[in-house]
Amino acid sequence: MPVASGAISLRSVLYGETFHPVVGPMAEARGLHVGQSRLVERAAIVEPLIVWDVGLGAAANAVAVMEALAANPSRVELHSFDHSLAPLDFAVRNAEALGYLVPWREAAATLVDQGRVDVGKVAWFFHPGDFRSGVAAPPPHAILYDPYSPAANPGMWTLEHFQRLFSRLTEPCTLTSYSRSTAVRVTLALAGFHVGRGTATGEKNETTVAATHRDLLVDPLDGDWLGRVRRSTKAAPLREGGVAGPISEDDFAALSAHVCD
């Protein structure tokens, strides 16, 4: 389906959400994920660079990674995660309409058939199933976090989930997300991530970049943001079985200590 920019994207009937709405698949993938993760710069100093693509969908983020790094002199591992390859299979069969997938159609088709494909210096792997249950992939240097929204897929945004994810990060790592939600940012911070503002995309004037180390952030959240958290009526972290509401005194104290550390 066409989005506001005129680009063609896919829409999930099951989840009721459009992939990369407003600006289209490649503009969002390049700017939000590949650019903010500084993959080209980091691939020059880390080998192999390990990238987790969480929410493969129709592979726009994966294509943006290959576009940027396939000719890189150093090795890269791209690990894509999703419940199903159905969106990518559909995209391969409709590559001409989507446009961005045409140069990568053969690679995508091989991934669908075999679960792995090499594209230049990029080794691309697919991991099916529930990402929350654990994955057999090496710890990443960058996570392109693109599941369905907290409203449609709440289990992928909980504090407990992000705590488990953070515990697996043994290398300096960034996580990029389209969300600008105060509750999501609070959740990431309480899970252990340092959290910062990301660049605009589409109708959003900010996105989110989280990291294991504060020096990986360009614009870390600060005391002014904490003031907004304090005043918000929906800043409580997204816990399993929890409800939206203001942040508790205990959570705010922990958040303040982490942000101001």
Spans of model-derived segments:
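Conserved Class I S-adenosyl-L-methionine
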Residues: 185-211
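S-adenosyl-L-methionine
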Residues: 1-52, 156, 160
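A short SAM/SAH-binding and catalytic strip from SAM-dependent methyltransferases
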Residues: 141-156
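A short glycine-rich, Lys/Arg-flanked "PGG" loop and its adjoining helix->strand segment in the class I
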Residues: 155-172
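Conserved beta-strand signature within the Rossmann-like core of class I S-adenosyl-L-methionine
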Residues: 142-144, 171-179
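SAM/dcSAM-binding transferase cores
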Residues: 1, 96, 119-120, 206-261
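The AdoMet/dcAdoMet-binding core of the Class I SAM-like
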Residues: 39-139, 159, 191, 201-202, ...
